[in-house]
Structure formats: C-alpha cells, structure tokens
C-alpha cells in the first residue's frame, strides 16, 4: 500500500475531497516524522509502537573481505506491533486483548 492508496481510502470512506484527504494524510505523516525526529515514541493503540533507538559505535566486518571496519553510532527506527495487531494477523481472537506499553524494555544503546 502506498501513500496514494491511503489518500484514496480516506477519500472513499470519509467523503473528504481528494485534496482534503491528501492534506490530512500528509499532516499525519509530517506529525509522525517530527515526533520521531525529536526522539519521542509514537504509540498507536491497536497497531503498535514506533521508537527511535540509539546504536553505539562498534566494530564490524566486511563480509566479502573479512576486514574490520568501524560502524558509526546512529539512530534507527524500530516498530513493535501491538498484541491486537499480532493476533489479527494470525487469525486469532483479539477482543480480549488490551494494548500494553511493551516498548519499555527497549535498550536505547544497542
């Protein structure tokens, strides 16, 4: 599914004009990007959590040559699906599940 597909779904299901649907989708994604760029977590109930984690500098190996190389410190985006989403994907009953803040066990400096 692409961003254009999401806009089309919003247009068809909510009845906004295509321009309004596009602006809404852009606003949502811009907000998510800004929050994540600021290092904050995004928790979407029934869907999952997006978390920016810090990765420390480390030594790795070039798989072709075996040569050791330095891998710079960086930030990575991780996604952890909610229990509800996992159950839905596996065709399991999910009405009894509650969303939990499962992201508290992330190690920010792996």
From Swiss-Prot:
Q: Its GO CC terms?
A: cytosol
Question: Which CDD domains does the protein's record reference?
Answer: IHF_A
- Please give one Gene Ontology molecular function term for this protein: structural constituent of chromatin
Keyword set includes Ribonucleoprotein: no
Q: Which SUPFAM superfamilies match?
A: IHF-like DNA-binding proteins
Q: Which UniProt keywords apply?
A: DNA recombination, DNA-binding, Transcription, Transcription regulation, Translation regulation
Which Pfam families does the record associate with it? Bac_DNA_binding
NADP listed as a keyword: no
Q: Which GO terms describe its biological process?
A: DNA recombination; positive regulation of metabolic process; regulation of DNA-templated transcription; regulation of translation
Q: Which family does it belong to?
A: Belongs to the bacterial histone-like protein family.
**Biological role stated in the UniProt entry:** This protein is one of the two subunits of integration host factor, a specific DNA-binding protein that functions in genetic recombination as well as in transcriptional and translational control.
Fetch the HAMAP family from UniProt.
IHF_alpha
Subunit field text: Heterodimer of an alpha and a beta chain.
What name goes with this protein?
A: Integration host factor subunit alpha
- Origin organism is Bdellovibrio bacteriovorus (strain ATCC 15356 / DSM 50701 / NCIMB 9529 / HD100)
């Amino acid at each position: 599914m692409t961003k254009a597909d999401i806009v089309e779904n919003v247009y068809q299901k909510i009845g906004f004009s295509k321009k309004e649907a596009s602006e809404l989708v852009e606003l949502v994604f811009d907000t998510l990007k800004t929050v994540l760029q600021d290092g904050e977590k995004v928790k979407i109930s029934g869907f999952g959590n997006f978390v920016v984690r810090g990765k420390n500098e480390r030594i790795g190996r070039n798989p072709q040559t075996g040569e050791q190389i330095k891998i710079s410190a960086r930030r990575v985006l991780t996604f952890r699906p909610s229990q509800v989403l996992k159950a839905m994907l596996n065709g399991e009953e999910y009405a009894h599940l509650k969303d939990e803040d499962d992201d508290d066990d992330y190690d920010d400096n792996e």
